[in-house]
């Protein structure tokens, strides 16, 4: 026993400053996209403070359009989270990258977005070894974020 209640332990977990970082090639790709004025956004489930702490730790707090379920009032796969981007950027095409096969791809598939699953490298909390319905399947699966370049070449 550590002498803390479950509530206290949850508070520590939810509000700690995580010690995480992006792989260097992922950070370089995002910087490259930013320099090319390609709009990036984030859709994330979870508590606002927890998710914002993660974004800050990853150096992604520069991304303007962030939809966090606690702030937005709906969770994936609710289409409202995705429609935020369609309403704000009506003339854009969207590519959605995620890793949770159970819920991440349902709404963007229905909306006609390009969907890409970042394959689990063994550290993901969401199992990718599951049976899923067709609507849950991404159109593409990549091993690392830099493989996104190959996916986008297929769009042209």
Q: What name fits each language-model region?
A:
Residues 4-7, 27, 31-34, 48-156:
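Asp-based, Mg2+/Mn2+-dependent phosphohydrolase catalytic module
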Residues 44:
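Conserved phosphate-coupling serine/threonine residues in phosphotransfer and NTP-handling enzymes
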């Amino acid at each position: 026993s550590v002498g803390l209640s479950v509530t206290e332990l949850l508070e520590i977990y939810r509000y700690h400053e995580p010690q995480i970082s992006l792989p260097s090639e992922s950070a370089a790709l995002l910087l490259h996209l930013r320099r090319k004025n390609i709009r990036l956004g984030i859709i994330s489930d979870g508590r606002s403070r927890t998710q914002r702490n993660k974004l800050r730790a990853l150096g992604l707090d520069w991304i303007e359009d962030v939809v966090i379920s606690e702030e937005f009032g709906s969770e994936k796969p609710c289409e409202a989270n995705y429609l935020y981007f369609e309403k704000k950027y009506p003339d854009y095409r969207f590519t959605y990258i995620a890793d949770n096969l159970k819920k991440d791809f349902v709404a963007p598939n229905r909306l006609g977005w390009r969907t890409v699953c970042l394959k689990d490298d063994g550290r993901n909390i969401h199992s990718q070894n599951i049976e899923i319905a067709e609507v849950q399947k991404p159109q593409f699966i990549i091993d690392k974020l830099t493989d996104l370049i190959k996916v986008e070449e297929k769009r042209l």
